[in-house]
Amino acid sequence: MKKYGEIRWSEVVRKAIAEYLEKLEEIETEVGSKEL
């Protein structure tokens, strides 16, 4: 049960980081286009 929980947790964290990075890229492109 503990091993399964750890694997599940790392999976959730990885997805959260991926989504966070995607949002950052979207914000950067929006700011860049506004500056231009």
UniProtKB/Swiss-Prot annotation:
Natural source organism: Archaeoglobus fulgidus (strain ATCC 49558 / DSM 4304 / JCM 9628 / NBRC 100126 / VC-16)
Protein name (database record): Uncharacterized protein AF_0619
Top-level taxon of origin: Archaea
